[in-house]
A protein has these predicted regions:
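Conserved beta-strand/loop scaffold segments within soluble protein domains that form the structured core
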Residues: 53-256
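Long, low-complexity, mixed-charge
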Residues: 1-65
Length: 258
């Protein structure tokens, strides 16, 4: 286990405020569970993350890259549904892996992630990239349940073409420590990203949530909406950034953290 820094802000502020990043006691994943796909028609093994994929930290990204890699390509004008289930087991309590998604022009995908397990201690480190071509539509639901006393690192990167739409919905209900690092690039005109996260943390659970969306394409739209409840000594850290180029003043953005 080593101390690292995670979820550093893209533009740092005064260090004495202690908001630029977070300290984390990081443990590399050990024996890895398997990722189970509900449909393998569009799935192949292997793949490489984009070179500018940063992740929560260099260490957490390296951990994910040491695991198995999968590539999912949805062909042009194809509609598909896919569920990826990862369950911590007695002899394989951890998980590390990379997932590369590409939606070709006009493709649509409903993607569900399910992370679960009753192991008292697990480390999950995932890194997922999403490339949406023109008019592609992606809906992602992310559900964590169980996994007591576990550390969950969810790292993702998305690039959208013209009029592409991406909707992330996360239910952060499991894990002792949850770290989310999400970067989106609205590269195409009239592209849209919506990030919605719901959480309910109790006991000593902690959440460190990072969202950054760059507006590059004209008339792009972004929403970051985080809501939930804390009880006992549970805590949450939220870092959200919506960056708009001065040449694209018609971009629309909403940021909410409750």
């Amino acid at each position: 286990m080593e101390e690292i820094r995670v979820n550093r802000l893209p533009a740092i502020t005064w260090r004495y405020l202690h908001v630029n990043d977070s300290p984390d006691q990081f443990e590399f994943p050990g024996n890895s569970a398997s990722a189970v796909f509900s449909d393998k028609r569009y799935v192949s093994e292997g793949g490489t993350l984009p070179t500018d994929f940063c992740g929560a930290s260099a260490e957490t990204l390296a951990a994910a890259e040491k695991g198995q890699a999968y590539t999912v390509i949805i062909p042009e004008n194809t509609e598909a549904e896919l569920t990826i289930s990862i369950t911590a087991e007695e002899d394989r309590p951890d998980f590390a892996g990379c997932f590369i998604f590409k939606l070709e022009k006009g493709a649509k995908l409903k993607l569900i992630w399910r992370l679960s397990g009753d192991r008292k201690h697990s480390v999950f480190a995932t890194a997922s990239s999403y490339e949406l071509m023109e008019n592609a539509v992606l809906s992602v639901s992310y559900l964590e349940t169980g996994l007591p006393a576990s550390s969950l690192y969810e790292q993702r990167y998305a690039v959208l073409g013209n009029e592409a739409k991406l909707d992330f919905v996360s239910a952060e209900l499991g894990g002792e420590k949850v770290i989310v690092h999400s970067y989106g690039k609205l590269a195409g005109s009239r592209s849209e990203i919506r990030e919605t996260a719901l959480y309910a943390a109790a006991g000593s659970q902690s959440l460190d949530l990072f969202y950054h969306i760059d507006h590059i394409g004209k008339e792009s739209n972004a929403v970051i909406d985080v809501k939930g409840a804390l009880s006992d000594t549970a805590k949450k850290i939220f870092r959200g950034t919506l960056a708009v180029s001065y040449t694209h003043l018609r971009a629309h953005e909403t940021l909410s953290d409750l």
